[in-house]
Amino acid sequence: MKPESSGGAGTVIVTGGGRGIGAAVSRLAGARGYAVAVNYAADDAAALRVVRDIDRAGGRAVAIQGDVSREEDVGSLFDAAERALGPLSALVNNAGITGGFSRLDALDADVLWRVLSVNVAGAFLCAREAVRRLSTRHGGRGGSIVNISSLAARYGGAGEWIHYAASKGAIDSLTVGLAREVAVEGIRVNAVAPGLVETELHAAAGAPDRAPRLGPSIPMGRAGVPEEIAEGVLWLLSPASSYVTGAILAIGGGR
């Protein structure tokens, strides 16, 4: 028998939940009453730090390894989360990579396929698994999915990362299409599209100074911080957004 969720708001899986926006979402979800499954691909130390933070604040969390681009890992992730924390109520599709900066004519095909595998296939596989568990059509009790997109999908990433921007464009399509597909099955599907945010993403892409350098060009005059993005995610997960589905919430300081 599956345990009842130890979080008053239910169980949420946050993919890529150990760092950056994912870590902020995981911590805030724990503070808002969710039992949190903090997924990570390789950095177990970062994921365990987030789990400890949630535990110390009085919440409940577990760290679960899994590569979201691998179908078998996705199934194992969801099974482990429900065994440890109780029935799923929400998914935050956050795991993603940039593949680094490159013009398209210099882009390595292996990099392209890896970005699409993690950012697109990974999100689709996780959303599929969530629907199978949440949909009233499959005996579920409904729930919420929030995908992490990017304003890069709107602007295209020219000269930097068209490959990354295109992968986030796919997330926007997934959000709108799936929202309509499961709207009468008790599942809301939305996305948050962050703009320039101070995370490790920029350093991983090879430009650690990118956020402070470009911040003054944003209408609000600065880059965002992960906690600001997390607030949008938690609103979309919450009953306060009960009539919102298929929305792509831009959080970009006016960009």
Language model segments and positions:
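Alpha-helical segment proximal to the catalytic Tyr-Lys
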Residues: 132, 180-181, 242
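Short, small/polar-rich loop/turn modules that mediate ligand/substrate recognition or access, typified
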Residues: 86, 183, 188, 244-246
